[in-house]
């Protein structure tokens, strides 16, 4: 056993190997204890917080145990100072990165088990649209912080690195200014709420149902099932008609009577229309029925009323019932509706 390798006896090298292998073995034991024994205890609790911690410490604790045993085993070896320094720095990096991994997993668990379910219970869509991108941002910042801390621990000057990142970030921001503008516009839309998911809107020549409000763009499904995607920045600068939030829908139509209709029957026609419209359960005021004009082939009655906004089918059914009732009453009263007609006069030659 007097044989030496790089100044270390075989016995010392064997001690290092045994300690390292012992660290791997104990690390696996700790892993099993965490996964089996502690999990059974934690599963009995009502809170999710301890489950989050359990899920977060699983891998880091194994890495830390193995690293500590490896680091301890090195003490039995004779190594140059620069090698020991490198190993010390490597251990620091491993510990910091393990802590970073724990932090990222912990943040992920807090969002998944607490914040996301909480926002699903709220009435505001802002929470639901912001929380998932926020989770990604927080995790990325945590990873960057861990990497910078690890670099700083081994002697790197992170000030110069941060300055370089600042210049790079500025260039990236300029390249992504449209994306950033759309992102901010998306946040403002969610805060201001000119419309919500499922609303019927008219904007920039598009009309349909809002299917998705994203961070970059909004998607509208038209009534012929075409999907239109509009950047949020354009939406923010446009006039938006929200047809869902109105409490009533306007009906404006013209009913033409034949020119040979007597005045009394014109008055009766107006009475019939107004009575039918006012008595229908789906209608709302104001109700307007007027003899408006002498048309090319008809005496035109202008009819205006409103229908409760309880869906498009409800609106169509109400108009259908009213129109059929008007036709039915006109037939009973002998009131004739006009259709395009022309009178042709023929002049005889002498």
Curated annotation (Swiss-Prot):
Q: How does it sit in the membrane?
A: Multi-pass membrane protein
Q: Which GO terms describe its biological process?
A: monoatomic ion transmembrane transport
Question: Where in this chain does the entry annotate a coiled-coil region?
Answer: none
Q: Which UniProt keywords apply?
A: Cell membrane, Ion channel, Ion transport, Membrane, Transmembrane, Transmembrane helix, Transport
Q: Name one Pfam family in it.
A: MS_channel_1st
Say if the entry is tagged with keyword Membrane: yes
Places the protein is found: Cell membrane
Q: Where are the transmembrane segments?
A: 10-30, 59-79, 91-111, 130-150, 154-174
Q: Which GO terms describe its cellular component?
A: plasma membrane
Q: Which InterPro entries match?
A: LSM_dom_sf (IPR010920), MS_channel_1st (IPR049142), MS_channel_C (IPR049278), MSC_TM_helix (IPR008910), MscS_beta-dom_sf (IPR023408), MscS_channel_2nd (IPR006685), MscS_channel_C_sf (IPR011066), MscS_channel_CS (IPR006686)
Task: Indicate the principal place this protein occupies in or around the cell.
Answer: membrane
Q: Which family does it belong to?
A: Belongs to the MscS (TC 1.A.23) family.
What this protein is reported to do is described as: Small-conductance mechanosensitive channel that opens in response to stretch forces in the membrane lipid bilayer. Exhibits a sixfold preference for cations over anions. Non-rectifying.
Q: What is this protein called?
A: Small-conductance mechanosensitive channel MscMJ
What is the protein's species of origin? Methanocaldococcus jannaschii (strain ATCC 43067 / DSM 2661 / JAL-1 / JCM 10045 / NBRC 100440) (Methanococcus jannaschii)
